[in-house]
Regions:
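Hydrophobic positions on the alpha1 helix immediately C-terminal to the Walker A/P-loop
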Residues: 139
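A short, Lys/Arg-rich alpha-helix, primarily the initiator
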Residues: 1-20, 56-60
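Short, charged recognition helix plus adjacent turn
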Residues: 30-31, 48, 54-75
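Canonical P-loop GTPase G-domain recognition
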Residues: 265, 271-328
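Short, basic-rich loop-to-helix N-cap that marks the start of a DNA-contacting helix
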Residues: 35-48
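Recognition helix of helix-turn-helix/homeodomain-like DNA-binding domains
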Residues: 22-37
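Nucleotide-state-sensitive switch-loop elements of NTP-binding domains
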Residues: 75-126, 134, 143-229, 236-242, ...
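Long, well-ordered amphipathic alpha-helical subdomains in the mid-to-C-terminal portions
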Residues: 92-94, 306, 317-395
Length: 399
């Protein structure tokens, strides 16, 4: 970061900063403009006072001009955001496609779009998980249609496992939510996880922000219930629902250990006809187990409710519980503190992804790095020493 940008970012005046490093404001102005280069002692003071944000390279090397950034038309950005706010599904879908893209020029465009987004604390973010066959899509569609009857706009982000060949979604939830997908007040988007368990977090969060900007009142995020994506989704929603089948035990359910512990609400689905009794038994078993564990979340005892998504039975009670849960979180301020934590998590996920992309695109192609890899292959260099050399190279050349 150049010194001028740092001072503006931190709200520090030239006069105040010049005083801190023991020089005149005139000298500092000359350093900032590039008219003069600071002496070594001054550069070290500047680096120390800025916690390394401004380093010697920022004085000796001019920053690279990002052509992708230069070509972005700010008027077109404003038009995109305006169209999203006015309810254009086409513009919304295009923006989410940009979010999912790995192309640098698309990511630069996304950054500019997001800078114009406003904070939205009115939307309710609902995570829904459960093993394949539990009826997640039917549940979301049935509840979503009921919410639309209440004049609410509903969106669904369905996290599909990705095809390793194409990187695209395998399941495609639009085919399983036929009524909801064609409703003018609904928006459904299958979202591929990118072939790795952690790939869901950043892209899904950013897609969710697009939906909030478009004015959707309720956003469902559906996951498979068999991997680490559940933890990532749990950390970006306001309430997390775990759907169960009318049968006993986590083992019989096929649920990954620990997912039940994430639940804010447990729903026994498919309480239809002959399975009504089994659903009630499962409900009582989990209620007893939760009572024994005695671990309330957000001041709530985790509730266990039953429903039939197919017959739209029990959904009103589930929605009532969600509203009470959200209102209580807002009253005790955990709703807003959680949203702040989610924002920080997004920031760190963005940092991790940027560094990973840097490593994958640049570091792995470098000739010096290839030599290190060959030495590791030939047992001439330890993994620890190779890691140290690569990290030093990355720090010197990329940061």
């Amino acid at each position: 970061m150049i010194l001028k940008e740092y001072l503006k970012f931190c709200g520090v005046t030239n006069k105040d900063f010049a005083k801190r490093i023991g020089i005149s404001p005139v000298s500092l102005s000359r350093y900032i403009s590039g008219e003069r280069l600071p002496e070594k002692e001054i550069i070290l003071k500047i680096s120390s006072l800025t916690d390394g944000a401004v380093n010697p390279d920022d004085f000796y090397f001019k920053p690279k001009i990002d052509n992708d950034n230069e070509n972005i038309n700010l008027n077109s950005i404003s038009e995109i955001v305006k169209n999203i706010r006015n309810g254009s599904k086409k513009e919304l879908a295009k923006t989410i496609t940009l979010v999912e893209s790995k192309l640098k020029k698309h990511q630069e465009l996304v950054k500019k779009i997001f800078e114009k987004f406003k904070t939205n604390n009115k939307t309710i973010r609902i995570g829904v998980t459960g093993v394949p066959g539990v009826g997640k899509s039917t549940f979301i569609e049935s509840l979503g249609l009921k919410l639309i009857q209440r004049n609410l706009k509903v969106a669904v982000l369905a996290i599909d496992p990705s095809s390793k060949e194409t990187g695209g979604s395998i399941l495609g939830d639009k085919t399983r939510m036929e009524k909801l997908s064609v409703h003018p007040k609904a928006f459904i988007r299958p979202s591929p996880s990118g072939g790795h368990l952690g790939g869901v977090a950043k892209k899904t969060y950013e897609s969710m922000l697009c939906l909030e900007e478009a004015g959707y009142d309720v956003i469902f995020i559906e996951t498979m219930g068999v991997g680490q994506a559940e933890t990532a989704v749990h950390d970006m929603v306001d309430i997390f629902l775990v759907l169960l089948l009318p049968s006993g035990g986590d083992e019989l359910q096929g649920i990954k250990k620990g997912i039940i512990e994430l639940a804010d609400l447990i729903v026994v689905n498919k309480a239809d006809n002959d399975l009504q009794k089994a659903a009630e038994i499962t409900q009582n078993e989990y209620k007893t187990a939760l009572h024994i564990s005695g671990k309330p979340k957000n001041g709530f005892e985790v509730e266990v409710l039953i429903c039939s998504s197919l017959k739209s039975k029990g959904l009103e009670k589930i929605w009532d519980y969600i509203q009470v849960f959200i209102n209580k979180k807002k009253k005790n301020h955990t709703f807003f503190s959680d949203r702040q934590s989610q924002l920080k998590e997004w920031m760190w996920n963005s940092i991790y992804q940027t560094v990973n992309e840097m490593i994958n695109s640049d570091l792995s192609k470098n000739e010096f790095i290839k030599k290190i890899q060959l030495k590791v292959d030939d047992k001439k260099l330890s993994v620890f020493r190779a890691t140290q050399l690569m990290c030093n190279f990355l720090l010197k050349n990329k940061f």
